[in-house]
Amino acid sequence: RGRDYEVSPILIAPVGKDALVFLNSQKNKVKNVTEQQLQDIYSGKIKNWKELGGEDLVIKAFQRPKNSGSQNLMEKFVMKDVEMMRPPSEWVATEMGELIEKVAAYDNSADAMGYSVYYYARNMKKGDGLQFLQVNGVEPNSDTIRSGDYPYTNPFYIAIRADEPKDSPAYQIYQWVLSMNGQALVNELGYVANEKSDVKISSEDLKKIGLEEKNDTVSGKYFP
């Protein structure tokens, strides 16, 4: 026999935004693509950079592993109901010596295109020769993501029970995350906070909450 449960009202508030961003090499003269062109690239209709005003190079359109955060956003925002083409792959040896096929990692070659989430990509070392592609003429940055002018933005929220006591840890965290200090931490982590904040989070404060000061150098694989 089923039980009757009382459902408590939820207090929910937006914390900030992330976004799906597209990248290619600074060696590539293509700086802007449209939403339709992105869908056509990843469905296999557009195959060469010259179709976008670039060099005569076959587009190496990298993808992310299935069910990763970036891939879920790609399917939701860009592809919608259109099937993606087969991704570039590579064979990797396991610890047991077996070879398995996996989605290839982005290599930033002149013919490459890839995508990631903004919070990760913005903290990558700029000297790696990457550039953000504009979408519909809009560059992904904190201002365009915050305003919603950039098309592929993804808001995230904080939620607690509406009847949570004001002196409870959950309520205090809720209030703090929405404060200027909390919004500064959202920015420090690489996301885009709802509100601009000039507050700086010190490395000592980051360590107090279990976070280390972020490292702007990334080597090896490019995307989460």
Identify the function of each model-found stretch.
Residues 1-224:
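Exported/periplasmic ABC-transporter solute-binding proteins
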